């Protein structure tokens, strides 16, 4: 369900324990809780100073997930599947490309704000870097190339070109960053 962000609704909702919760049991955090933390963070002094904490960064969770996978590798228990079909059965139906549970929560929170197809349905992000994190995980950059980026009225438009030369636009609402500074 798409629900545009009313930032004032999230004032005071950022919970500093969210990092620990995401680390220990990401399944205990739902999309609305992630929205509260993501958009509630924009009311903190740290956000006003330009900081984004690890727990709200998809890049952080990607690196953390890779570290955890390396720490838990056990080649003795590794079994090669009998066929490709068994591999495909285990794949998530998620529209996101190879993401950790924490990254998926952030993506779902952003996706719940719009579809990014028009300025009116722009995806709400808390800074420009989060746009690029989103694009890397939702759109395979090997397929699309960033052609142009423009900002008007707090809406950032990324124009991406595919192999056939078609241009696709993705709109992000970054107005909160401009409001806060």
Give the residues covered by each predicted segment.
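N-terminal alpha-helical interaction modules that lie
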Residues: 1-68, 113, 117-181
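Alpha-helical protein-protein interaction scaffolds
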Residues: 36-110
């Amino acid at each position: 369900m798409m629900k545009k962000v009313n930032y004032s609704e999230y004032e005071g909702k950022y919970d500093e324990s969210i990092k620990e919760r995401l680390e220990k049991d990401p399944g205990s955090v739902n999309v609305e809780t992630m929205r509260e933390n993501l958009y509630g963070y924009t009311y903190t002094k740290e956000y006003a100073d330009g900081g984004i904490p690890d727990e709200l960064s998809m890049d952080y969770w990607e690196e953390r997930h890779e570290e955890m996978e390396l720490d838990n590798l056990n080649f003795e228990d590794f079994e090669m599947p009998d066929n490709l079909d068994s591999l495909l059965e285990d794949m998530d139906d998620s529209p996101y490309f190879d993401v950790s549970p924490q990254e998926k929560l952030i993506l779902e929170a952003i996706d719940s704000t719009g579809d990014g197809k028009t300025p009116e349905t722009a995806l709400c992000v808390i800074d420009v870097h989060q746009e690029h994190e989103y694009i890397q995980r939702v759109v395979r950059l090997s397929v699309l190339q960033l052609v142009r980026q423009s900002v008007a009225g707090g809406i950032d438009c990324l124009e991406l070109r595919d192999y056939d030369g078609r241009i696709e636009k993705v709109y992000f609402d970054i107005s909160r960053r401009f409001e806060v500074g």
